[in-house]
Amino acid sequence: MRNKILLFLLTFIGISQIAAASAVRDKYNFNAEWLLYVGDIPEAKEVRFQDADWKKVTLPRPFNEDEAFRLSIEQLTDTVMWYRKHFRLPAGSKNKKVFVEFEGVRQGADFYINGEYIGLHENGAMAVGFDLTPYIKYGQENVMAVRIDNNWNYKERATGTKYQWSDRNFNANYGGIPKNVWLHVTDKVYQTLPLYSNLKTTGVYIYAEDIRVKSRKAVVHAESEIKNEYNRDKKVAYKVEVLDRDGKSIKSFEGTQTVVKPGETATLEASAEIDGLHFWSWGYGYLYTVKTSLWVDGRKVDEVATRTGFRKTRFGRGMIWLNDRVIQMKGFAQRTSNEWPGVGMSVPAWLSDYSNGLMVEDNANLVRWMHITPWKQDIESCDRVGLIQAMQAGDAEKDREGRQWEQRTELMRDAIIYNRNNPSILFYECGNESISREHMIEMKAIRDKYDPHGGRAIGSREMLDIREAEYGGEMLYINKSKHHPMWAMEYCRDEGLRKYWDEYSYPYHKNGEGNNSFRSAMTNKVQKKVDARAYNHNQDSFTIENVIRWFDYWRERPGTGDRVSSGGVKIIFSDTNTHYRGVENYRRSGVTDAMRIPKDPFYAHQVMWDGWVDIENPRIHIVGHWNYKEDVVKPVYVVSSAEKVELFLNGKSLGNGQRDYHFLYTFKDVAFVPGKLEAVGYDKNGKECCRAELQTAGKPEQIKLSVIQNPKGWKADGADMVLLQVEVMDKDGRRCPLANDLIHFDVEGPAEWRGGIAQGKDNYILSKDLPVECGINRALIRSLTTPGAVRITAKADGLQSAEISLSSAPVEVKNGLSDYIPGDELEGRLTRGETPLTPSYKDTKVDVNILSAVAGANQDEAIKSFDDNELSEWKNDGRLNSAWITYSLERAARVDEICMKLTGWRLRSYPLEIYAGDELIWSGETEKSLGYIHLNVKPVLTNEITIRLKGASKEGDGFGQIVEVAAPAAGELDLFKAKNGDKTNHELRIVEIEFKENLWQ
């Protein structure tokens, strides 16, 4: 108790005492003491409007948070609402500049201060700022009012143009002010804010050049846009100080003094070499604070602290380098809303770290935020946890022209300016569908103007043949390149509810059972009598599918030849309140549920992704649980990166598993016996390298409560939350994996129950009666603005109850302002350590290059079968006697593997014969795939290989449940959307072919 009191007092002292405005610059938390009204009252802009009966809220707070995961995305309420705030500036603010920064509003917003209209912001995605100085009443109360319309069909007022990304499929409409708001008070000589929307300013830019990773050196540059709003010239000195993560100053330097005329904007710069640097990396969120200050007449008048990191990047030869080490992209395409049940996207900064940090714990190195610019809080979170980001601006499924394209370029410009100091962003993405070469060049020019030194690649989805793109990649399919890197923007759309273990245990869900219809993402209409099995998995089959799909990218990793895949991102990390195809009214493709409780695929990816390219740490995971009825006989699946896996039941060996897709081991017909099930992995030398076990749990006896919270303590600011975890345990403290008990919760004290999610009516959103699923569940509890003790009790029929006590610490708010900036107290995580200096992969294959080709038809197009362009192909004329092509190799070689991408890869099986000179080295039918196939051929020394069709191809989609979102388009070589794509005759069609020699280790 004494320690709790001491922590309480220290926290109070640390975040209290809002002093008078400082001599330089103040940033205030502007989230407190807002008032919310749902409905349109034009008079609400007036200062004297009576708002005493409005709902009191702390931002960030969407007006419709109660609907998150209760309603499907297209049903989320859209309407007009007003937010109002009363505040006073601290003493000493007079004659200073005052700016307000909104990290984002949804959708279109009109802003008023003291009854005066100050501006409009409409894109619903990016931050916006306003200069309040002309309207502020110093020493008096000020009133800010914001009218917001989150209509799904909101159109830009000036042009009547709808924003492409205001979409009912992917952009969950949590309307109002769902992000943070800050107030800045500065001198009249000041560094601008990076808020191009409305203010037209670019702020501070920090970057490093001449990075030498091994010697830990780099030249650090600081650049600030400044303004002089005095009525006389000011001679301004520019100074820079760099502090390490512990706050220790490691370097100070300065630029030349500059005379800035009244009303003038100038850019000041300084740079210096710094040694002993720690470079930001995957799982290594090492961040520095760079303080840039302005000095006039020997006095500091302005200072901006920028938290950033330094890292080295390179993009080329189909690969990506981070700090001189090749890294294959492994991660998730996550909805930008990154939402939670009962609150939507508006969670405290520490909870963003928890969620994004789980991706790193899952051995993901990349998150691709889909369609819309991510929230600044998530961007900064990824900096801290060491998670690479691909930053979207705003789009939907198509390239656009006219005003809609201009909206996209403007948003990209604003997003780059706002986020260019965040080291975790390595990619700027210009579209969720291929854009034209001209548009790619235009976007690239924006990057070059506003972030020329950030070490970031700019590209778009696909871009398979546009060399101006610096990266690209399709959805669902596998791409390879020896030019700009290709990584899959989205793969494995399958869905599975966490509750469903398998068909052998409660609730006995057979794979695929559920609906036979789903809502189309293109038409928003229900498609009936469709195969929806892939969207109603149990956890066994969901895990297997995730293993199979990743294997496609792992097989093409760096080290397997000249043309490689740079990996891919699985859709999605956590279940999401967006477009779905399964039974529930939300998408369950996540490897965690919406409360971030892991499903089995979470652990499968942890196994498969533990390395920069090659596996560096062998792991093993047994899929499922070990609690069944005595007569159950079932397959046991193990995911492991070991070379061999042996299964033991109560110490008795059940033999070695059948290995498929490199990572999946199957043990058929295992009879259940209570006790301990162990899987042991062995390396290539037969030495044990990893081990996992499952234990049979006993009868459910008791409830266990635990809490996940801010590492700096729970804050009574009306926005902070704790994540309450509830488990059902046996008498020995083992979780009961089949428990589905309904738990009733009571909360006493200053806190608000926001709840969790479970299968049932309204998904149990906000309900204090919440069942566990597979023995576990979680709920969110939000603080109020009153600090104090909170007690939570949990009860269920037939189980021993549990309770837990918490305490929230006070946060001082004075006149609507607070010094407490939640993200500033959170530290970078260094869990994976610094970038290793060793190579990330070993070459396992080498290519035998092609000199030329002779074909039975269309000779002039034969080169297209080996031109590193997946949008081109060679094909014959449809006659069997012309269905052949002979390749001349650069050297005589014993080719033992042929890798091909054949047109119609998911629809067609080609009956082929392959010859080395005159000797037959392979004969058979090719498998259907999502891109490339690999044929193991008889190695014969030759410098000439012929591919010949020996009959009509067999048709039929091999991946009927894998469907695209975009509308049909002609000319796509998968032929999936092509008219008569399954009518083959005697066509031989090759997109790309590679001849390989394996380097046996």
What is the role of each PLM region?
Residues 51, 55-60, 113, 825-895, ...:
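Disordered, acidic Ser/Thr/Pro-rich linker "stalks" and the adjacent N-terminal cap
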Residues 61-89, 93-101, 106-114, 119-122, ...:
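Active-site-adjacent substrate/metal-binding segments within catalytic domains
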